[in-house]
UniProtKB/Swiss-Prot annotation:
EC number in record: 3.5.1.108
InterPro entries: Ribosomal_Su5_D2-typ_SF, UDP-acyl_GlcNac_deAcase, UDP-acyl_GlcNac_deAcase_C, UDP-acyl_N-AcGlcN_deAcase_N
Gene3D superfamilies, per the entry: lpxc deacetylase, domain 1, lpxc deacetylase, domain 2
Keyword terms, alphabetized: Hydrolase, Lipid A biosynthesis, Lipid biosynthesis, Lipid metabolism, Metal-binding, Zinc
GO molecular function: metal ion binding; UDP-3-O-acyl-N-acetylglucosamine deacetylase activity
Species this protein is from: Dechloromonas aromatica (strain RCB)
Record-given protein name: UDP-3-O-acyl-N-acetylglucosamine deacetylase
Family: Belongs to the LpxC family.
Membrane-crossing segments per the record: none
Claim: Zinc is one of the keywords in the record: yes
Protein encoded by which gene: lpxC
A single GO BP: lipid A biosynthetic process
GO cellular component, as recorded: membrane
Amino acid sequence: MLKQRTLKTVIRASGVGLHGGVKVNMTLRPAAPDTGIVFRRVDLPEPVDIPAKAFMVGDTRMCSCLEKDGVKVGTIEHLMSALAGLGIDNVWVDLDAPEVPILDGSAAPFVFLIQSAGIEEQNAAKKFIRVTKTIEVRDGDKWARFEPYDGYRLAFSIVFNHPAIDKSAQKAEIDFAEQSYVREVARARTFGFMQEVEYLRENGLALGGGLENAIVLDEFRVLNQDGLRYGDEFVKHKILDAIGDLYLLGHPLLAAYSSHKGGHALNNQLARALLEQQSSWEIATFEQAEHAPSGVTRWLAQAAA
């Protein structure tokens, strides 16, 4: 049986929120089977639990933000991406501020923390969302699409008309069966442009951003002294974000995802469109591991290594 997964032990980390710039302490705790990923704001008079679900997403400006009764948890996508990439089904995420810490701007620190704590299999079948019909959403020349696929594959293309980005690959594809999330996706950092910083900060965004937690570009070049971690780091980060955004479906996907010029808003629209069209997907479990797609078993074995 392909089993659900949680953490072996508690994980603690602290940092600043990318957009709010406020220090935040985060604790990840093991959770029982079928709990899912649940964020808990512990800084309030009464703790508020917000499940990581697509229909709980409110603001999608520059990040994915969950909201319940006016209580928010923002910039969840990098942590969600790490949890998805490592096949973690159930975890409590305690926060004492309204944002997940940005750490280095990628998913790699979260991957390191989770792997350090250890991954524990649980005595319950892992549930997948298997896409059975093509679903597409569009916004002008931007689009995102799900298609049936016996595994999990993501393809993304970007257009920024910037010299540094134009020099990098602007298309990338990741198949969980063939490529390592940890090695080839998790280290890709978020990126931003100096000319946008003033506008963002006037609107209460990017207050905690800097060279230590993002790729920063001026009009011509990357300002980070160490340069890029991947030749295609910009588009790889878009894939990293998409993996996190789409994990708000509540289960890992069996599907091919593709997008052109997409982002958090379009990813959330696609997830909601899929959930609303119930004839386009089904829940799949595998009581016998050998009956699962070979790529899925390879991915899960690799993620637990």
